[in-house]
């Protein structure tokens, strides 16, 4: 922005808005109008014109640079500050809080000018903060009134009051702003439309009687939306929501399309199936038996209704309508379904399967019409209660149809739903980027302003210059801005006098220098920027550590922290000028919630954001928000003596005051010498936080320095002027809260300090926390007296310990400093709560206080980085999500009220439709709380069941609309935004371990000390033993030096120095989990000896290592830099002998056998040594010479074995065997006993397999040697599995096969398929990726478990023992409280009458373990209802539950779902995605889920441009055929066929199950027409394309469909009976629509999505394969354990573990965690009376139908975790990844489609695919292309300017043309050359024929000749051209007369242009594409010029040809 434009900031920039100012504006407008020529007036809003300043927008706060507003200027019209409005009629008004409001200066309502007192008053009221508060309160009160379900009469008056207030508000707004004509008037703000409609509706409903009032009353709910317009942060979030919804449009279209296709398939497959029921037949009454045969003959023809011929008594219709004749399972509302195919559900004896009655679930679940099918599929896609649909459909149609569900779930559900996620995340990311960019731009603008400020103030500073000389000197050297005041001493911002400032500074200076002298001379050495760069930037180099936070950690250590941010929840709404970057980052910045010691300043942005000033303000004053935060960017390391003292005043502003401070032992300063230049440089190259340009660019460095000084100045003034607390408070604090009165006390204090601050104490406290948690987790029901007394004593002890710790810490630290630290406040809070709880222990109803003890668990976060990170992430997200949560709350509130108003009455009136006893069900909308619960349940994704109820009572349309809106708005958008926020706060930095702080490392220091001690003892013992027994061997001496190094290194590791070496090393964890970067063989990064020494000499030096490898701005590492993987291994071992590599990611290992034969051919035939060197060294016998004798024989044997094992066939054979043996396992189901032959075959096969595998193992041992075999994880797996088979074989042979242990071993055979893993490359890749993720998944899993532990213990406290109830076990009903009130009454019943039973709910909260299981069911929303009902009904221990007695227990579950389920499960997704991204970086950005082959496919997909021109199908010579050919190849023909396909689909959609005969006939004929049309298309194509027709895949497909359709017309009945109905194939035709998409420009987004799907397929296939393997193993395992459990709940005749197929069907269902509770329930039956342990199973020897609860729980939980969390989330990761890649691809200016289009056009010009085109055709060709490659005619000039190389015959190669055109689109750049080389390579690869393509490049000599020839030609030609040009231009001059001024210049340009072409380097002849400007002015008539060009080109062609000869 030009400087003249800027209003000078500062208080004097405000001017009153007067009539003069209005006149001035009018004058400016008039002047501008006059200036502007007429034609320009149209495009006033030019995009590049000036824009309003975004900081001065209405609603924003006034930037602090303007200073305070003079009091008389508050709330009155002022002139507009924004230069943009200088000629617009506007003015601004500022209120006390400095919020800007902008008004139009035109008269409001044509009456009130800005100077009218009425309008002035209205404005004053409008901008006043109280007015806003009043409106806010009104809205909230109004919301409370709206929640009343039947309000009392007096509420009517309250309603009037509300309406009155709203009307008043609108009137004020209209008076102040005007109504709607100008900008900034009332109706110009969309939020005001809302107000307007609300008020209008209020009056309309009041005065006009409109019938259905309740529907209109629901509009009042919109008032709740007004909160959004009142609270500032909410508008932005709503903006973001709306943005993401816009972005979703493509996905939505795609989703609807896919769903329609699937729904059509469903309609065709299952139409009417779900009405099949089991009908009792024959009927009971014997009189019906007459004439049954005749009945059958005619009842089952047609529709089975015609039977009344013989017996009139029997009415078939009535019979099948009567529900009592159907077979019902107990407790079910719907009759049992069945099917007529062999694998469908069968009816019990005495029943037949008949289609009758209505569909299940009130008739709403069906595939009978398209709309119901669509609903069913939508439900499938959102995975809500889909197991029910799945079971019904399979039961009615047959198990084979599982395939349909697999497709829909994997393609529809996983893919589409995750696409929505991906789109939302991307939209969010983009918005974030935009905010960041805007912030940077602002920063630049304000820098300008500041410089201006500085200029204005320079004069005033001259006086102060002398005084500040010293300090400037100092600030130059040490570079710290805090004490410097280079420029604005006498700043206008300050109200202080100069003198005061100077004095203050002098005092500071003296204090400073007393301790400074000795260091200062070192610091002052040089003022050069270099020293700043070296010392100064030390701070940001350090990575995530604020340099001076801990370096002198005095008791006041934490004052420089950001604790303040904890107290300012709304800080972003008023961040100040200088923290722009920070403001955008807030959402994800880690530090908002970082506690002091761990505030890791993660990245420059957040570091800059929150340096000194804790953002904590009393009220809305913001000039102090963070001036310093920008300075912090340049803050160099503090003065080297840590004599710093700082205090925080009440306002949270830090003042740095010099003064002696006691250093604690932990905070010793770094010895100067340690940080050598090399180290810093090294660290700079590897730490990726530093912004290099900041360091390198001198101007920005200077600017930064100057800014720092300006700011620090302002800082100091602010500190003084801002001390809000009266001084007496400080006095009080110093007197009472800092205890250092007398010497002896100080000694005591020192002692206490030594003890309390010792790491071991910390360790002890941590152990206490863990023990305390354990004690709390040990509570259970029923507990013995003794046990509970032990627990309570334990609790007292722990409370005592924690209290003591707190008091000792207070003594050691003084209360003032103790409470400066977050953790201490937290401790204090918990301790006081525990004490309070002890006091109130016996008060009834306060037992909940006990659950506060659980918060102690969070103290672990102090020493557990991941937990800390999780809490921070949740904290941050809650900050950013605060607004989002509010929006969500508003949405939930609105829908809850809407539901209550619309449907509440219907639930009451029609209740009998949905419940048998006419009582309101638990889920209803009659009152607000239940309505809220329903809406919440919909947000959890469970909408279908509540919607059925609603539709049944209140009508289908209303319910569908409301529920769909909640579903789409709430569920999809908000929850996804939630996820996006979580993912964004999950940058890899956060995962970087934050263990770089003293306090935090205390634990590890303690552990380190112990480790050291143990190592010392070990070493002594080892030395002793060596002295005593072992002769010293030379070999040992060799190892010694290395070991020494390790020991030294050990000592430094145990000191918790984390070594930072480079970015891409393997980070391993040593024993105690400290991450230390261990160098790989990348030479650049390996630490050299001197560095080691510096680490060792100075143990307190801490350098941090990010675990996650970040992307570096400094160098793009090429993969070449990594040496081979085995080197990595070696260096790992060298550097880290002590560390166990548990953290190492993917099993990089030595390359697996036979993987890289081509790399080391000489090695691949030689086996390696059998034993490790150590073995050989210790046991000499292992070493044999292989040169002669036995040794040689042995060596030859090994070589032979090696050849065998390495042979491909061997591997194939083994894989085949593995598959066979796995397959054999699938036969061992419950029917094996009856099939004797199979059983014996399997037994023999089993032996054979075992022998084969043992042989394989022996061969491998001989071939590879033990060392290789047993160091490979996959080999271990083989080894263990073979062992299992061996053991069971021997046991069988010895006759021990019936032993329990052996039986359980047999089940381990299920693991056999795992061996296939290492053999299939694809799966192995996925498994490796997974293994890499395991450490972090485990970490998060642990954290989640801790998190859940809290809820579990709370659950035990609340519900233990309260779920027991008394039931009548014959009917299964619970007794009413009036009958049975408690356990003793139930007992009495049992004694008198046997049918009662006191029973517990199976899944309960009786102990912590069961609590976890219950919570898992709640978190997966499966089986959660029963648990919730039990909890809500519970009363107390041994009391009979009562319906909804404990209603608000629902809230426990709601809270758990929000924190335990949404957060933690999404966190998993976050971790997994994050992890894969890191691993991708590690593997050089390649996709880790794909094998090499698949990568090739992937790359081919990405670059379809590798197409070469194909021979087009030649046009037939025959005239008639030719015409048809032309017709068929036109686009119109294609599109019309597409339209026909769509119409055909529509007719298929119209079909319904119960359509009339007439309708069926009509559809038949329509279908016939379509078949004729499609046959016609087929015939026409056959005629015109001849045999080429079959070269195109689509055509073959069409042909097959047509044939099938024709056959189907005639043989429809027959085919349908034996095969699938042919209509299905028509559906597949829809896929042809994909072809249209290319023709539609608007469909680009959808094509991107499909492209992403195509790209994901290989990886998804691998993951699917792995999932199948897991399912296979679990299915085998399930068959062997749960085949005989009792059939109840989820296990029945079709869904069970009896056979392999059934197990797979069940497991597929649980993959999405659907219905696992039902399958688990029967397995939890452990004994009578739930099941019968002695039940016989005919045909097998097994007894009993009880399950094994522990095995069952393990089975299901592990399967859910593996499949749901891991595999499904990997799916998500792949899709997100590919989606972003695809979006990037589609954003490029030239996409694959453009290249494809180029080749399509090319085919027409080059029919024989010669790859050349004649120069003459070029112009037409260029014109025929589509944009962006199109060069429209006239294009000769441009084409010539491209200077394309030609070969003989004036032909040009297609690549040259494509390349030149591409260059024209993309412009010249380095990338172009890369692209060109790539394209040429690709072309050569795809054209082995290599047509003589290289017209220019031959040998070097030829090249030189050519170059010289060309130079000569060009020189001559240039001479000719000059002549011509001169001639022409002279003619031109004569013609044009006076207008010739420009020509000479143009002539020069032309000559230059040609010059460019003649430089020898440019022989590739591709100069710039634009035509020389001179041509137009020089032109002779077009034709001549054309001929000249042509002849020139011909000359050139000849020249080249000659030179070639």
Swiss-Prot record:
SUPFAM superfamilies: Voltage-gated potassium channels. It comes from the Eukaryota. Changing residue 1882 to Q: In DEE11; increased neuronal excitability; increased peak sodium current densities; gain of function. III repeats lie at residues 1190-1504. One of its GO terms (biological process) is sodium ion transport. The lineage of its organism: Eukaryota, Metazoa, Chordata, Craniata, Vertebrata. This is Sodium channel protein type 2 subunit alpha. One of its GO terms (molecular function) is voltage-gated sodium channel activity. Changing residue 1823 to A: Found in a patient with schizofrenia; uncertain significance.
